[in-house]
Amino acid sequence: MSSQQFPRSGAPPPGLGANPPTGPASGTAGLIAPAATTSDESVRDPEVAPRDQHLGPGGPAPPREEKQEPVVVRPYPQVQMLAPHHPVPPGAPVTVAAPPAHLAPAVPLSFSDGLMKPPLKPTMPSRPIAPAPPSTLSAPTKVPGQVTVTMESSIPQAPTIPVATISGQQGHPSNLHHIMATNVQMSIIRSSAPGPPLHIGASHLPRGAAAAAVMSSSKVTTVLRPASQLPNAATAQPAVQHIIHQPIQSRPPVTTSSTIPPAVVATVSATRAQSPVITTTAAHATESTLSRPTLSIQQHPPSAAISIQRPAQPRDAATRITLPSHPAIGAQKQQLHTMAQKTIFSTGTPVAAATVAPILATNTIASATTAGSVSHTQAPTSTIVTMTMPSHSSHATAVTTSNIPVAKVVPQQITHTSPRIQSDYTAERSNLIPLSSHRASPNPVAMETRNDNRQSVPVQFQYFLPTYPPSAYPLTAHTYTPITSSVSTIRQYPVSAQAPNSAITAQTGVGVASTVHLNPMQLMTVDASHARHIQGIQPAPISAQGIQPAPIGAQGIQPAPIGTQGLHPAAPIGTQGLQPAPISAQQPQADTKTSVVLADGATIVANPISNTFNTASAATTVVQTHSQSASAPAQGSSPRPSILRKKPTTDGLAVRKSLIPPQPPEVASTRVENTMRSTSGSPRPAGAKPKPEIHVSMATPVTVSMEAVSNQGSEQPTIAVPPSSQQPPSAIPTIIAAASPTSQPAAALSTIPGAVPAAPPTSTTIVAAPAPPATMSGALSAVLGPVVPEIKIKEEAEPMDIMRPVSAVPPLTTSTVSPSLALLANNLSMPPSDLPPGASPRKKPRKQQHVISTEEGDMMETNSTDDEKSTAKSLLVKAEKRKSPPKEYIDEEGVRYVPVRPRPPITLLRHYRNPWKAAYHHFQRYSDVRVKEEKKAMLQEIANQKGVSCRAQGWKVHLCAAQLLQLTNLEHDVYERLTALQEGLIPKKKAATDDDLHRINELIQGNMQRCKLVMDQINEARDSMLKVLDHKDRVLKLLNKNGTVKKVSKLKRKEKV
């Protein structure tokens, strides 16, 4: 490992060769000299690839991963590496060369050191949860690192995506990834900063990355490593990339991350020495264009690297708060130099996420990317690929970032404001897309976008930070998830997606890995798997899936895809399990429809991988990403949860839209870009709706994933398994799949396309990956074509969003995708189908709201009387009470108990009604009130009253008289007693002698008088009362005369008779 520590500046790994990046020289020695590091790392150069692989899967890296103390800032042993990074001043601005044209030209990403820093978290603050609007993204600029990344639009969108270039790593893809990674790295690096240099070696980086992530120290230089080119666009950009990759302070890196493509900035993240890696990219760029298109970072070779790095890295990342970063870094480190850088990301991915979390987190994703990148770089060829994916992921640095939502942080890019992804993405996106290609993961693109989101990221990373901790890889995933949500749409899930993305990228072959990444958000685990990466990757994906699910429904789906190969079954399961949680997210994902969403994470992964291999893939990637972003918000991360929550589906919708944009597969990259663009363009930026974005992703992913798979497939398979063990169980299946897939690539591919459309499919694709790029493209195109249309349709259904997206996918998937995929798709789609029927989602919700409001009003009017309320309650009470009293029984002692029914208390209020009618208690006009006129009763009427004769008899008077008589009698009795007493007490002779006796006598006398008086008065009253009856006879005569005859019917008469 020590070699890792300081990669030998001397020779960059082959991949790196082209751009050895000054890495060693310019970047921090440790980080940057990717080549050297890489070599040292394991075999560095030549060996590197294998080594990486080893590392990833089972080699040192993984252990490293395991080892990485989550907490430790210092990168593992590698830590030393970090110091080297040191050199880059935090403030150093990084310029990203023109990323893809798409990217906004000259998007400067300036990140304040702070932003960049691990503090990323703080960055997040900007908008912790909500996706940051583009402006917000800007905020990210806060990134500590002063890094400024300028993106040149100029970069052509070449699918090649210079991303790789960016990576600078040889591993183009790697680079891209790198960038992504870088971004992540930034953060990672930051972590790294902690004193020790990162080791490029898996170890270093990872550690460093973690350290960087930790952000703890900006010191590390972050290499911007911008992937400047966004990745797609200009392959040429790579150079830019290099530029970027200048070691920027780690913090800056973060910033970089911000940059969109350059976002690669992630590179900044790269911050790590990786920079050098990036350099490689440049060379790569060209390649990138080619197959690299994926650019990617593709760096196929890297794929191996990927495997290597990532895993280890992830752990590291986990360790650092940056965690994500660390791990990422760690992993990266493992990878080649370049790779390492990338790797960093990769590992970083998870880590990055974490690290990045703050910043790039996304990078973390990148991590995946990174991994890829790194890997790539390492093995430029293969390795890179792996990385690449991530790369593009990274590439989207942002992407990666995205993944991690951390990246989000980075997102600083702000650019993205756009929907989740932020238009930025547009440019970025294109990048992304291309990235995607290189990234391989669709996500990447999206991711990239995400990256932008990343700004959001700041927030994002917050989340993910936390997540990280759990485990390197898992962290990321989890982290992501959280982040994702918080992050903008893009991150969205995905973060998970992103993460996954990266992962995938990294995984490349493993597209899965990406997936994992996605999960990363969720699981991150996958990421970790990165290490497995490649192979593991596959597994990772699965795990990602598992993870993702949480974040994204898609993810859940993805798994299936992954599963597709052999895993399929397992994967799906995982998915499902996971999925559920995410469900809401998922739905959005579904929305994404494109599977994208689902795929989001997954897809990306897949794509990324493929992408690495093909451009087309890239497109997919994009879609995926979008979906992710869309989804994320839905997930609830949305800044304005209450508002948005209501219609989470919408998010999905956004995704959908994106999908449409994508053009034919071949154009995948382009398409992706377009989509991305649209996404970013869409006003919805902050909104959760990233619909557009999603779509894009979808398509490409398919291809990509295939490719990646193939890449990894052979190499990684074995390795993969180990990772899987590491990962959540779900991951394992993936791994397996990865291993077997190589041979099946073609078949897998075919499935994949379908799958891609369906989010789940994407996953699948990844698994299958092994197919050659060409195949990929074909499949992709096939998928794409149909998918897109589907998607469009979906779009309309936004409201249904969630469900719908799914449905869209299914169609495609079914035919193309493997059965398991189809299943997944179906699952996803089903809901959509159900949903579809409705109007657009927006309207529907309104409708519901409307109904609700009216209902409430009605309820209030009708029910709200106190009366009713009380009755309702009383009824309940009564019911309870009725039950409670037992039937009557006699106890042992013979006492009889009878149940008593509680009766409501008698109140004047019982019949009081107080309805909510304003006029109820008020008279509005004088005419409302009339004085009641008393009628003088006519004799006839009186005579006809009921009981008149009885009254005339005076029975009441007699009754009263009798009672008065009783009173008189009582008084008379008292009077007699008093008289007797008085006579007994007072002897006539001594009457006056005793005062006491005298007083008693007086009192008795007084009472006697009172009694007489009362008796007299009562009698008087009684007499006068009875006088009323004196006229009785006369009255009765009149009554009988007038009353009776008149109204008696014949029947009554007969009865009387």
UniProtKB/Swiss-Prot annotation:
Basic and acidic residues composition bias: residue spans: 41-54
TM helices/strands, residue ranges: none
Bias-annotated ranges (Polar residues): 289-301, 671-682
Keyword annotations: Nucleus, Repressor, Transcription, Transcription regulation
GO cellular component labels: Sin3-type complex
Chief localization: nucleus
Role: Acts as a transcriptional repressor. May function in the assembly and/or enzymatic activity of the mSin3A corepressor complex or in mediating interactions between the complex and other regulatory complexes.
Descriptive protein name: Histone deacetylase complex subunit SAP130
Organism: Gallus gallus
Gene symbol of the encoding locus: SAP130
